[in-house]
Amino acid sequence: MLKPLGNRVIIEKKEQEQAAKSGIVLTDSAKEKSNEGVIIAVGQGRLLDNGTQVAPQVSEGDTIVFQQYAGTEVKRGAQTYLILNEEDILAIIE
């Protein structure tokens, strides 16, 4: 398992739908990259210059929206994860 450091989180991206609303099946090149995912691991938080640690605002299991091209993809076996900085998270979906 991956353990994020600092203010990073690890997410599992939600897959984009295979068909458009009109029913047409989309090819891989026609699909937009999904910018939603579920957090599976959270780092300790951000360390300020004065040594204070700020706790993350998100938790494991949160469904989030993140910036479109943010993060680094990492493959572990057959699964692909995305490592993001907490600042790249735009919202929590409730």
Curated annotation (Swiss-Prot):
Family matches, as PROSITE patterns: CHAPERONINS_CPN10
Domain of life of the source: Bacteria
Entry GO CC: cytoplasm
SMART domains reported for this sequence: Cpn10 (SM00883)
Chief location: cytoplasm
Intracellular or extracellular location(s): Cytoplasm
One example of a Gene Ontology biological process annotation: chaperone cofactor-dependent protein refolding
Family membership noted in the UniProt record: Belongs to the GroES chaperonin family.
Function noted in UniProt: Together with the chaperonin GroEL, plays an essential role in assisting protein folding. The GroEL-GroES system forms a nano-cage that allows encapsulation of the non-native substrate proteins and provides a physical environment optimized to promote and accelerate protein folding. GroES binds to the apical surface of the GroEL ring, thereby capping the opening of the GroEL channel.
Subunit structure, as described in the record: Heptamer of 7 subunits arranged in a ring. Interacts with the chaperonin GroEL.
The name this protein goes by in its record: Co-chaperonin GroES
Species assigned in the record: Staphylococcus epidermidis
Gene: groES
